[in-house]
Each structure stands twice: as C-alpha cells, then as structure tokens.
Amino acid sequence: MRNGINILSYPRFLSFCEVFVLLLCNFSDNPKLQTFTQMLNSLFLSARAFPSLITNSSSRRAKSSQFDQFRENRGVSDAAIKVPTAPWMKGPLLLRPDEILDTKKRNKPRKVEEKTFKALNRRESGVRGKKAMKKIVRNVEKLDEDSDSEETQMDDLSEFEYLGRIEEKVESKDRFGGKMPWEREEERFILRRMKKESVPTTAELILDEGLLNRLRREASKMRKWVNVRKAGVTELVVNKIKSMWKLNELAMVRFDVPLCRNMERAQEIIEMKTGGLVVLSKKEFLVVYRGGPSYSSEGQDEISSSLYEREADRLLDGLGPRYMDWWMRRPFPVDADLLPEVVNGYMTPSRRCPPNTRAKLTDEELTYLRNIAQPLPFHFVLGRNYGLQGLASAIVKLWEKCIIAKIAIKWGALNTNNEEMADELRYLTGGVLILRNKYLIVLYRGKDFLSDEVADLVEDRERLLSRYQHFEETKRESDIELLEVVTNGKQLKETNKSGTLLEFQELQRKFGEMDPRNLETEAEKARLEKELKSQEHKLSILKSKIEKSNMELFKLNSLWKPSEGDDDIEILTNEERECLRRIGLKMNSSLVLGRRGVFFGVMEGLHQHWKHREVAKVITMQKLFSRVVYTAKALETESNGVLISIEKLKEGHAILIYRGKNYKRPSSKLMAQNLLTKRKALQRSVVMQRLGSLKFFAYQRERAIEDLKVSLVNLQDSAF
C-alpha cells in the first residue's frame, strides 16, 4: 500500500502474478529490481491484452510470418521501442523489437484429426431412434434380397454355434410370435393422410408454358394490389381490376376474411366476375391476367360436380337466386336479400302435434339435431334484419324436403343483428331455433310441422267432421220427444234440453252472475285447502323418517353398555382439589373430545395421559352446559377416576379428571366390551344429528299447519 497504491481498487480478475507485479512496483526504489520489473511489466501488458498469444506453441510460431520476419531482421535495427506502460509505472518502458510479442489476431486453424472413438461415446441425433432402426432394417432386407439368403444362412449356421440357438428361439414363438419388435410395429394399421391431387388451373390448360412462366415472373415482382374486403368481390372491386388492366396486363388482388380461408373458391369468383385468368396464387394474393383477344370463357368445360353437390343443388332449386360470392364449398346458397320482403297472402303455417308427443325438444334431441346440422351445407345467405317474408316462405318450402334450415349471415353486411333475424324468422315460420351466433342461424321445423299438402288434408277432414256434427245436431233436435208434464191440472210441453244451447244458457244464467268477491274467496279457500293437504303430507313423511332414525339410534345405543359406578369413591379435600385444578389448568397437553363423544378411543387416550401425569384435561366443544356435565359424568364413570372440576375456556369447556391414588391401568379388552368403536360412534353421532334436524323440521311443519287452519277458519267466518 505504499506510494498511495491500493491493490483492491483494481479489477477483481487480477491474477496472482499481476498482484506480485504491483508489489514489486511499490519497491521500485531498489535499483536491483528495476530490470526485473521491466520484464514483468512487458509480459503483463501482452498477456493482459491478448491472453491467447502467450502460449508457447511451435505450430503457432511457425505460422506467424510477420513475427518470423521481424525476428530475422532484428540485427538490422536494435533501437529500443517505447511501448505502453501500466498506470502505476513512473517512467517510460523501452524494449527491443525482439522482446515485443505480435498482437495481431489470427484465426485458429481447425485440427483435422479423425477420432476413432467418435461413434462409440459421442451422442448423435437420430441414430438410436425408432426411425433409424426402421431404416437399418430396410437396408438389411434389401441386402438379403440381392444375395442368396438361404445359402448364406446355412453357411453361417455351420460356422457359428450360437446362431442355431437364436433360430430355435425364433421358431418357438413363445414370447414374440416369431417376429422382431420392429416387424410387429409395421403390421399395425396406420391411416396415412392422403395428399390432395393437384388439379391444373384454367391458366395452365389455356396459356402456353412460356407465356405462363413470363407472367408468373412479372407477377412475383408486383407490389400494388386491390383489396377485397368482407363484402367479397363487389362491382367496385371489379372496376378497380379492369382499370389496372388498362395500364398493365396483370392485376394483383388481396383477399380478406372470409374468402382468404378458401382461395380456390376466391379464384373461381374472381375468374367468373372479371373474365380473367389467375396465373399466380400465393397466400392471400391472386394475380389475374386479363387475357388476349382470342381468349373466351364460353368454351370452357364445366367442372364435374360430386353427387353431394348435385343433390344439394336439386334441394335448393326453385327457392330463389343463388349467391355467387359464396366463400365456402359448393353448392351456392340462396341469396335471401334478393327475395321479396313482403309476400301477399303469406300466413304462418298451421301446426298440429301428433298424439302422445310433446312439441318441446329435450336436451338429447337438441344435441342430436345440432350434430346433424353441422355437416349440412348452408341453404340461405342473409344480410338484413327485417322484411323476411320471402325468406320465410322459402324456408317453409325447404322444410318439406329437409327438417333443418341453415342460414349464414353475410360478412361485411352493415347493421346486422343475428338476434333480430332469428326472432323475426321464428315468428314468421313458427320453427324451433336450435343454434344462433354471429355467423349462422339454424332453424328446426318442429315436431308439429305440417306441410301444405298435409295441412290441406287436415282442414278438409275437419270441415267434413264439422258438417257431420251439424247434421247430427239438427237431426237430434227434430226428433226430440215431447214430454207431457201435468201440474195442478195444467198440461205443459217441455223438451229434453240435455246437450243443447238452452242447457248452456241456463247454467250461465244460474252460475255466471256470481259476485267476483265470492269467486276470490272460493279461490283462496281452495288454495289454502291444497296447501294444508300438502303440508300434512310432508309432515307424515317427516314422522316416518323420525321413526326410522329412532330405530337406528336404539340399535346403536344397545351396543353401548355404560359401566356401573364404583361405590368406593376416593375422597379429596378442598385443598387437594384446588391444587389439582390449578395443575390441570396449567397443563398444555389436553385431550379433545369430538363429535363421536365418549368411545373406546377416548378412554385409551385418557389412560395414556394418566401414564405420565396424574391429572388429564379433556376439552369438549358442546354448547349446552347440561351436555357438558353429562359427558363429564360419563368420563368419570368409565375411567374410574375422580372429577375435579369443569372450567369454561376460550375454546370450550375443560373437564379435569384425577386418576386417583391407587390408579391401575385396566386392560384394553375390558374397555372394549362396553364401549362403542370409532366407526359405530360416528354412526351414532350422524343419526343423532339427523334426528335433531328431522324433529326441528317437523315442528316447523306443525306450526305451518296450525297457521293454515286458523287462516281457513277466518276465511270461512268472513264469507258468512
């Protein structure tokens, strides 16, 4: 620490040699050490800046051309060179050129040496895996196919003895069934994903290969495009594409949702509406070629559709115009916005539920219908909230062929509300809404749906039935027998009025003019009587449960035989009792009494406490003091101890029991004879708790019945 130099102020990565140099610098007054100090400083500077250059490698010195040149020419110039010094040095440092190390960085050449142990202890990825093993097996099988495997195997068996043992194990087929593990794995059924066959595009079929390649090269350089929003390929988009074609033969189009999810459909739409050819497709971009003067789209062959599409088209025929900007798979749904808003003479279809059936759907039926509706194609596309009578009439026609109508909501349509759409359609059609969100609406025709033909037949049948009823009524009135009733010498002519309009009018005249107050009184009386009957029924159920619980409690109590108290009770003086009470209150160890009460385990714990101390403290959580006293007496009787006192604590009541002066621990067999086990004690506690709850609820029912009877009596008194 001389001359104001603090070693701790330097970086912490100083080595022991550097610290030694610092100490030498502090003693620089000694002239004998100056030369040694200069040598160490030069070595320190070179090693500090370039630690990799201090290695004494023969190969490194051989490859350092500049250093060799400098060493060869050192005899030419032996002048000292001033080099940078450390901060603690007082004077300059002068060294000869041959004493300076070359500080130029050089790339360390890689040593090309073959390591024979690389394949043994170095880890290689993909060498010991399942795929690698399969490749090895395939290569071995190929080798076997090329060579004569049978002769080779026979020669090997003759030369080596252990191969015969392996063959015997393979023939046994006990463990592996005669096949190696990788052979069994290959026999498993694996359903591979089939690659989609690449279908040539329209541009590849029409344009020449050279022209198509040139157009694709130019298309890859384009940086300007036309955006297609959610509304699809509208007229504005088509006009922008055609305006770009005036300046260039190519136009780039970028699709937004939902068309970007189905670029094949987007390509069909763009070619159909613009009349061009798509020459390049990449992600959500399409490049459209305007085509030459000889190109015409009329001569193209129609794409053969699948049976699924043909059936769906046949289902939608006659319902309305199709929506050609459809962004999903075929068939094209009906554009509901082009259907009329108001249909003259439209009425909600009549409905009639079949006998012994409910029109309301159950949860299982609703789930089943949703699963059915998921793979179905969309039938309609809707973009407005009101004026849906045309769509409703089309849905009713569709329901004659299909029980479910699936409606998609247009992307990009303004002010659409799927809730209002669903409510309007449900009101107009009378169907059942099984699914609704911001993308689609699914309607079920219902169990009570009747097609137009069936509804007409039902109406004709009802009309015929009413005609027959009218005929029977007129015939019965004409054939009524006249009854002669003679009263006080007078002859009266009366007819049989049963089932006629006169009978109804008489009943209406007799009972129809009752006071509304009397009707309210009768209704209230009927309600009270019904409630009284219900409460009495519930009370009878509670009483039956109480009887059952009493029987269970009686059986459990019969298993417990309380021991008889000992007549020879040990007498304690007041001083001894007070002393034992204080000892018991100061004790930290205690025995907690749970919901099971006094059983075999409690007595074992009590005697275990008495094994080490004279007083045992038992804590119980019972709220009623009478139950606490009963528990204390039971503990005193069963343990043959002396009850000291019962103290009120913060956590409950503490029962202090003294074991006695002549204490002797009884055997566990004697204690288990008359006490309940842990399981039986828990069952007894549960039954007692249930019994108390049932009695409480029965008391509430009895009070409610009494109140109802009083209300019924008061109502009858007020009526008179």
From Swiss-Prot:
Phenotype upon knockout is: Plants are albinos.
One GO cellular-component annotation of the UniProt record comes to: chloroplast stroma
* Span of domain CRM: 205-301, 359-456, 570-670
Give the UniProt subcellular location, in the record's own words.
Plastid, Chloroplast stroma
* Gene Ontology molecular function: any one: mRNA binding
Which positions form the organelle transit peptide? 1-77
**Entry's SUPFAM superfamilies?**
YhbY-like
Keywords annotated in UniProt: Chloroplast, Coiled coil, mRNA processing, mRNA splicing, Plastid, Repeat, Ribonucleoprotein, RNA-binding, Transit peptide, Translation regulation
Gene3D superfamilies linked to this entry: YhbY-like (3.30.110.60)
Give GO BP annotations, semicolon-separated.
Answer: Group II intron splicing; mRNA processing; regulation of translation
| Name the record gives this protein | Chloroplastic group IIA intron splicing facilitator CRS1, chloroplastic
Q: Which organism is it from?
A: Arabidopsis thaliana (Mouse-ear cress)
